[in-house]
């Protein structure tokens, strides 16, 4: 079977898990009730998933990078438990005003993933709850799904008629249902 998407890129906070601010330990990470049901709906559309996330809490001193790595390991284990192929989690710890080309809305993490896993980004989709998730996707020729969970409702006004996501949904589960149609 040919996959619709070579890879599905996911934002983390506000997209697959609640976004209470800065998540500094595994116990603070709460997946939405529908997250894995949604990802299982998406599984037939792709070979794999990659998470792309800004994590400036490290640079702000709110979380140690070792704790972030523990959180990432926990996320990997949850994907594995649900028979979902999570290739990698890319994160950028840069502060918003002092960022490299890796912090979203820049494309660095996407380009690194593309290079490391030989992924054609134009055959991928990015799913996120922030304008910053959709900007690099559009700039790289990726499809996009904007979810209104997390920061989505707050960021929705930032899109205009010339620059908008390919799909908009209330949350990841409803977006997944739309994508599998």
Predicted regions span which residues?
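Short acidic-hydrophobic, aromatic-tinged amphipathic segments that line or gate anion-handling sites
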Residues: 166-171, 175
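A short acidic, helix-capping loop that chelates divalent metal ions and anchors anionic groups
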Residues: 20, 25, 57-62, 95-100, ...
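Conserved hydrophobic residues forming the short capping helix/wall of the S-adenosyl-L-methionine
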Residues: 75-80, 114
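Active-site neighborhood of HAD-like aspartate-dependent phosphohydrolases
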Residues: 1-50
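Acidic, Mg2+-coordinating phosphoryl-transfer loop and its flanking beta/alpha structural elements
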Residues: 126-167
